[in-house]
């Protein structure tokens, strides 16, 4: 069997706000724009937004975005309105943040 991740789907009650975030703040190319379904090209997989309530008690996955220069990328995204914490360094650099619905996202050079 040969499978791969095709898309990550977030259910949201704020589809327009979330679309603006992934398109305008993170700079992802929007490839589908329907009333209750939006998709964004995230370089090898798609992030999809589906209008509707999240499942009660369920937390979404963390999406980790690769950035060669984590500090410069973080600074640019924060200027655009993204929320990220401090950069942590171990074997690699990473920085955690949240999208407008509170789903965890991360920048990493790993």
Residue map of PLM features:
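Vicinal oxygen chelate
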Residues: 1, 74-75, 79-110
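Mid-chain, well-packed structural core segment of small domains
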Residues: 63-77
